[in-house]
Amino acid sequence: MKFAVILLFTLVVLAVASESVEEDTREIDVEEFQEQQRGCADLRQPCTKGDDCSCCGSDGVCNCEHLHKTGCFCKTAGPYEKLKKWFKRCPKY
């Protein structure tokens, strides 16, 4: 009998906890997320010099060394560049 009461109590606590977690995930500010999306550039788009976080995703880094173009553009990162960007803790878009 004690086991059944403890099991029932545990299930109620888990149900309440999972509802609060679901509510927290639903409260993501959509406007803030869209602003962050606009704050980064896709591959082959202009980016901020020296700021790899200005390129979206973990695969994009800012490259300012081009033979035929002036300016800085996002390019696909190599393994070292991905690791370097990961250590910067850039927001994930």
Curated annotation (Swiss-Prot):
GO terms for cellular component: extracellular region. It is found in: Secreted. Belongs to the neurotoxin 31 family. Contains 5 disulfide bonds. The keyword Disulfide bond applies. Keywords: Disulfide bond, Secreted, Signal, Toxin. This is U12-lycotoxin-Ls1e. Residues 19-38 form a propeptide. It comes from the Eukaryota. Residues 1-18 form the signal peptide. GO terms for molecular function: toxin activity. The lineage of its organism: Eukaryota, Metazoa, Ecdysozoa, Arthropoda, Chelicerata. It comes from Lycosa singoriensis. Expressed by the venom gland.
